[in-house]
């Protein structure tokens, strides 16, 4: 089934200006204009969409019963942008979403509609989401989404942003209707959605297509033109979307017409409008014209040019100029030649007459067969009144409604180039009410060749016929039997012989009849037979039933030619005449009779023959779909199913087949943490009770002993009428759908073509009571054990039952579980069983009252540091599945506290841990929450938490003694170590601690033997609340949390909280706090800020400023257009890159002013705040994530060689100048969106390349200004590189107005240094130690070496070890830095 346009079905190339959603803005790619497609039965033809950008016609994908989800996983057609007619999906199994199939479908124009709809999704049994996240406009028509049992994400779509009018949308009987969908828009699981929200029916709701794709909502002022990713309005000629604002060449689709890569309001010369959406040239239209003229296929039009349009034919009043295909106005009456493709055109209704409206010349023959109609004469004159000439013959046959032929008011010529059998050019037969031909006083008619034929026109006078002979010039051409003298104008007839049927055979839609031959004395008088038949439920039909003077006739009449007969009576072997009746209704009784059609003459009377009326019934066939299936659950193990018989039983319905199969819960429910704030808890409801009176009686009589239910109020007449209209409309749509999509299968030619009709293997009939309840399916979490074994799909086997009535109680089901039920009607219990198309319905059993209760007591285990581990057993067979647990605990005398435990967290710990409990008596209880709601609370469990400092004095003595001895021993060992260290200074081969993410000098080296002392930075523990994990840091887990009163003027602040692992040693805990002490000295807006320390109690916490967008490297990569986690923002502009550069330079200038050298400046170690400010520092998470950015040289420590300067790689020199080299690489990362530097080179090759004087090439399309900055940073001579203050000075004029208010560059702290300090800064920068407490060492080194270049390098190599600001030496590596070659 194609597009229905004949020769228009050839795909033509098209270069469309389309911006690929999620791709590079403004990207142009080639595509094709493809014809409409009907893809059914299998996926073979689906690949024809591979290169289509536009489907000029409709797209139907339907009736695929053997496809599976994996068949669609690798299928994607990203080039498809627009469908000009409609999109229909119907019964495609295995298809779960359209997001991968049509990721860039943006516009459905609706030029031709499917039953008034442009988008139809009907009975898609596995579809879970639409996923058309780039669909922006449905130009004409509405949306119909119906009977999709798994379809969600419908309530989250704002159709008013896609269609102009949503009142005619029909979206019913989907899973979304039952509120069973846990629709989660992107970002909701993290507590903040990224999707726009709009108001529908008074509800302000986020809009999205799937859990990972928001609905794009443009500003209202953009109307339907669409907008860019930044929300800027497209050009007025755009439709749906664009890549750049106000540019007609950057549209995804065009509002009016498309021409040469841009959208235009109208097609300029020499182009013409075509199909209401594109411009074509004359050659294109000419090719269509000649192609169709030569092919003469039905429905193929010979296109012409008119009013700047390439259209199928000229309108009325115009004729085609064959030289240029133009439609030119006629001079006077306009000849409009209408070609009859089949040679003959039968006019049997007003509709068929309208097809000839405006025609003046008929190239072919006309057959008029009108039996009835309203205002028929006026309608025929309006449509046929302009016909002046007929090239063939005119036949008026059995037109009971005609009284005159005057509606042919301009007909003046019948050429007779094609004649009816017997050489007739005018043929009038059996017109019961025809009284007049024309008013011959006013009408002239010429018949060029051929004869006249008049028979069985009882009300047409012979004088009228003879007048026509004279006027038309045919007098003398007729033979004796051409004009019957006794059947024209005379109703008498004689039929006295009985015809008998000799053979009858039936099928479900055909009847084959044969009867005994009949020949009059002169066999030439037999014109043929007339077969009459009609539906007859009862055997009481007479011949004249349903006929009246107005031409109404309830009989269907078929003209049958007489059998062939030889003129030699001796050799005649007459065969039995017969007829095959087609297109009948199955299992229907028909009344049939046959009579002869013979001629009458004035010389003799010929007697005819007629049969008796017989009754024949067609055979049975497959019944239609059972109507109105309703499913309800009356208990936790039963579902009641009711339905109505099919509208077309097509036989005696003997029984019904019912199949049911348990459905697995949505896999997304296992992955989401429903304890997060803002995440909607999924809900499932069982099937509601019946509402109709019949259903209530049905329930009470068979399944419910109580009759105390309240009655519902009777419905009003308007409600009943509305329900009837909706039911009728729904049935009409389904009939239309089935008539369109179910077409006869082509007969197989023996080539073994696969029959893809839905088939079902016979299942063993089992007792319903023996159905085994299976356990719910659990996802495979890594490293998680569970007491509930996962259930595979094989265990959800289907069951079948044969039912002899229109209801069934399905028992033995699992509580609160969804079931998919199929229902088929069957007739004739025979070996070749006939079962019809299945109806589908979904139902869910009621919840079990105690199924969600936790069995057994809640146990506990108390650990040190006042940590209590609570443990309990999962409910063995919950209602659906458990989504979370609620823990309620309280200390005696305090208020009750509640803790939410997610399913995933419970699986990890088989319970949960309560931390930071104060000493005292506690009670705790737990309850589970399933898809059905909350279970019951467990019985309270009691435990006592002691004060870990409250220990007996004798135990204290036992512990304190050894501690004193260990302390004294440590002091002695430490003294020896320091003495040896002073005598053995570290040289170039000395040890250096390097972490996989080194940044700052650690306070552990500043105060190696100190113990942290609480100060004004101390924060009470109760003011810190942990919300969620951010990742693993150097010492332990890093959390996002809330801190109260930690910043002056803010009641509550979102912070990052670093912790120490429980297994950490005392030294590691001290180092952790000492590292926090280092951060206390940083008070720069562009350096991550310390907010407080919690050192009292366990665990130790360090509270830092929260950087909401993570590290700069991840942030830049997320801005790539093809990134899966793209937040919907475009890549940074030049202005934004300059702002980032200045913020990093300002933070580094501050650190240098504090005499700190970074040594690992990279995008991974810069953090991005909520307002996209970039700051120096991280939360200790990049060590595991980016360890591949480091290189272990010579078996020693890890070094970030791709960011290191030549002198650092060669001599181990780390200075402010080497930081400047790294700063240049950071610039390169910003402009390349965090690509890997020196891609294609190994770490060893990078070492050699940089030490030999090489550096990075600027990225493609890099702004020249940033390229110049990079090259300044990559000067081989360190002294030639700029300082960070100079970088800020170069960029200060292009920065945000807020920069002077917050930056170090403009602060009072950045005062000009004294001359001697300035001199030291430039000359002795390499001597700046990593320990800011070692100023005396700096002075001593400067005096000893005299400031020469060689001395500086040698002195630098004597720097002391250092560690990362977020980690101690445990994550460092001791390595020997390489010596420079003596040469």
Curated annotation (Swiss-Prot):
Record-level GO BP terms: adrenal gland development; amyloid-beta clearance; animal organ morphogenesis; cellular response to growth factor stimulus; cellular response to insulin stimulus; cellular response to zinc ion starvation; cerebellum development; dendritic spine maintenance
Record location of the Glycyl lysine isopeptide (Lys-Gly) (interchain with G-Cter in ubiquitin) cross-link: 1080
EC number of the protein: 2.7.10.1
GO terms assigned for molecular function: 3-phosphoinositide-dependent protein kinase binding; amyloid-beta binding; ATP binding; cargo receptor activity; GTP binding; insulin binding; insulin receptor activity; insulin receptor substrate binding
Main subcellular localisation: membrane
Active-site residues, Swiss-Prot/TrEMBL: 1160 (proton donor/acceptor)
Catalytic activity entry: L-tyrosyl-[protein] + ATP = O-phospho-L-tyrosyl-[protein] + ADP + H(+)
Site (Insulin-binding): 65
Entry-linked CDD domains: FN3, FU, PTKc_InsR
Positions of region (Insulin-binding): 734-742
Modified-residue entries (Phosphoserine), positions: 399, 406
Glycan-bearing residues: 42, 51, 104, 137, 241, 281, 321, 363, 423, 444, 540, 634, 652, 699, 770, 783, 921, 934
Side Extracellular, residues: 27-759, 764-957
Keywords: ATP-binding, Carbohydrate metabolism, Cell membrane, Cleavage on pair of basic residues, Disulfide bond, Endosome, Glycoprotein, Isopeptide bond, Kinase, Lysosome, Membrane, Nucleotide-binding, Phosphoprotein, Receptor, Repeat, S-nitrosylation, Signal, Transferase, Transmembrane, Transmembrane helix, Tyrosine-protein kinase, Ubl conjugation
Residues annotated with Phosphotyrosine modification: 400, 1000, 1186, 1190-1191, 1356, 1362
Record-listed ATP binding positions: 1034, 1058, 1105-1111, 1164-1165, 1178
Domain called Fibronectin type-III: residue spans: 625-727, 754-848, 854-948
UniProt feature, compositional bias: Polar residues: 771-783
Disulfide pattern: 34-52, 152-181, 185-208, 195-214, 218-227, 222-233, 234-242, 238-251, 254-263, 267-279, 285-310, 292-300, 314-327, 330-334, 338-359, 461-494, 675-900
Protein's cellular compartments: Cell membrane; Late endosome; Lysosome
Cytoplasmic face residues: 979-1383
Role of this protein: Receptor tyrosine kinase which mediates the pleiotropic actions of insulin. Binding of insulin leads to phosphorylation of several intracellular substrates, including, insulin receptor substrates (IRS1, 2, 3, 4), SHC, GAB1, CBL and other signaling intermediates. Each of these phosphorylated proteins serve as docking proteins for other signaling proteins that contain Src-homology-2 domains (SH2 domain) that specifically recognize different phosphotyrosine residues, including the p85 regulatory subunit of PI3K and SHP2.
Domain-related comment: The tetrameric insulin receptor binds insulin via non-identical regions from two alpha chains, primarily via the C-terminal region of the first INSR alpha chain. Residues from the leucine-rich N-terminus of the other INSR alpha chain also contribute to this insulin binding site. A secondary insulin-binding site is formed by residues at the junction of fibronectin type-III domain 1 and 2.
Assembly and interaction partners: Tetramer of 2 alpha and 2 beta chains linked by disulfide bonds. The alpha chains carry the insulin-binding regions, while the beta chains carry the kinase domain. Forms a hybrid receptor with IGF1R, the hybrid is a tetramer consisting of 1 alpha chain and 1 beta chain of INSR and 1 alpha chain and 1 beta chain of IGF1R. Interacts with SORBS1 but dissociates from it following insulin stimulation. Binds SH2B2. Activated form of INSR interacts (via Tyr-1000) with the PTB/PID domains of IRS1 and SHC1.
Full protein name: Insulin receptor
